[in-house]
């Protein structure tokens, strides 16, 4: 993140944003006349990435709470399919909870508002995990679990996209939800408007806008996997979390009642 201009420039990495401690540029070497651009000198610490996982980021904002409840739940009889995990491949530990779908890459997590999720639940199209726990019929439990997990998967896309890093129109990104008909991942379409905002259009053609309330968008995250002694980083993934003003849907069947 870069703020200011001229000789008054402040730069922040993920860690500096978390700590609200931007770094000041002390000297600027301008070599543009020779075609080499500019070099910026920082006398303080180096730029660092975020230390917070997606899970920790979600826990710190009430506005993310309904999505977090869905992400944190799961089937106790098939934990390998739950989306949050504290251990990867039974040998790599996490700081707290990692998203199991992440694989040494960068991602975007779109979080619908609590109101949007609650409205879907009231309509009977998006169950909660308590509905799963209360169900006794195995087929019903299977339908409920799949409806929740697939809903979550469609809100996670490959590639981190931010408000403020330029403009782009009609760019498709794959999500983590697989289309069983063609064995390809469903996509979303992103339109970035520079510093003015960003919209996401789902597979049904409905457009959702990123909520640009301070602290609820562009939240940088990094998830680590350590060896069992927690002394060495085995791998890590980057992600950004945005609050959006409605849910994303990939299929009309999602709008049918699950019961």
What are these regions (language model features)?
Residues 1-259:
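Mature, structured domains of secreted/extracytosolic soluble proteins
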